[in-house]
Amino acid sequence: MKKILPCVIGLGYVGLPVFISLKKKFNVVGYDVNYNRIKNLRILKDNNNEFKKNDLKIKNNSIFTNKSKDIERCNFFIVAVPTPLKNKNEPGLKYVLSAFKTISKVIKKDDIIFLESTVFPGTTDTICKKILLKNKNKITDKEFYLGYSSERINPGDRKHNLKNISKVVSINANQKIIRKVKRVYNNVSKKIVISKKIKEAELSKLIENTQRDLNISLMNEIMILCHKKNLDFNEVIKLAKTKWNFLKFNPGLVGGHCLPVDPFYLSSYASKSKYKTKVTLAGREINNSMENFITNLIIKEI
């Protein structure tokens, strides 16, 4: 059996924790196009303030690099790059496309490639695969293994950390390859959940965050209503919580890289089938309006 040589592409909030988990067992290449990020990591400095110096110390032959030639020896690639929205809230895949173009230049027979970035269903099996097939070594889609594993990291959350969050993994491969995949990802998460279809794994990620966004939007809507009717929102929720199946979510601003973005990925995916996700978009509209609502409340109090 070939020695597993992982490469994590993208060393941000998602990729760096994966790198740190894997370097305990493997010689890992941590690759990022941002030279300043690499320079800081080499001197054991994490600008995101998620990890301490001891966490970033490297043993054996693991490295941080921004040079694509350093990933040529790798055979297990994990892509964890941002997928921000473009103008008009359309999905933006430029970092994913760039990462897969980089891999296509070094891909070899029997390589395993995983996408962890949040994308709309079909991205892995169609868009990413198409890029890989343009490789210079003329490797066919029968000679490499492409999969998807959604990231679930919650930055700053010490309770729900990378190791104890279950990890969904999907790849079109035989049991031998799946065992190899588990061998790698078991160093990241204690519980691996296998999905039979890559598209279903991709969609599940969008739903996780969209559900939370919608639940918060409902609380925001009720809070606005209570304000207009001069009712105590906290008292209303306290009373509602006395029912056993009431789910408590807090109102407020919804930010970050995921919750304000993923509903639009879901909506875009649905629109390809000429279906409009009305509830999803309504929730986004409410949450987007909260900035003005809260600002106006503060101004009135001044």
Question: What does each model-identified segment do?
Answer:
Residues K2-L5, N27-V29, V33-F76, V81-P91, ...:
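Conserved N-terminal Rossmann-fold NAD(P) cofactor-binding segment
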Residues K3, I216, M223, H227-I302:
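NAD(P)-dependent Rossmann-like dehydrogenase/reductase catalytic/cofactor-binding core
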Residues G15-L16:
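N-terminal Rossmann-fold NAD(P) dinucleotide-binding loop
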Residues S21-L22:
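Aromatic pocket-lining residues of Rossmann-like dinucleotide-binding sites
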Residues V81-T83, T118, A173:
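Short glycine-/small-residue-rich Rossmann-like dinucleotide-binding loops
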Residues L85-R152:
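Rossmann-like NAD(P)(H) cofactor-binding subdomain of soluble oxidoreductases
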